[in-house]
Amino acid sequence: MHVKKGDKVKVITGKDKGKEGVILAAFPKQDRVLVEGVNIVKKHVKPNQLNPQGGIVSQEAAIHVSNVMLIDPKSGEPTRVGYKIENGKKVRVAKKSGAVID
C-alpha cells in the first residue's frame, strides 16, 4: 500500500473529491483507508455504557486506497509514490519532486 497512517492525502474520486485529510487508520488486507473528515456516514447506535442515550452518530467510513493520492511534502500537490533503496532501507519517494517521504 502506497500510504500509511499519519500521511496527508487528497481524495481524487468519489463524493468527497478534492478534500484533504490525514489518514487515521489503514486496512491493508481490504485495501482501504480511514481519512479524517472524509466519507462521513451516520450510524445508528444502541444505548450502551459509553453512550447511554444512543441515537445517530456521524463518523468516517473507510474508502478504497486507489481513491486517494499522497500529498507531496515539498510542493503540497498530490503525487504518485515510488520506492528506492537508500542506505540499505526501502524508502518512499514522491514522483513529482523526488523528495523522500519517510
UniProtKB/Swiss-Prot annotation:
Gene3D superfamilies: 2.30.30.30. It comes from the Bacteria. Keywords: Ribonucleoprotein, Ribosomal protein, RNA-binding, rRNA-binding. Coiled coil: none annotated. GO terms for biological process: translation. One of its GO terms (cellular component) is ribonucleoprotein complex. One of two assembly initiator proteins, it binds directly to the 5'-end of the 23S rRNA, where it nucleates assembly of the 50S subunit. Belongs to the universal ribosomal protein uL24 family. This is Large ribosomal subunit protein uL24. The lineage of its organism: Bacteria, Bacillati, Bacillota, Bacilli, Bacillales.
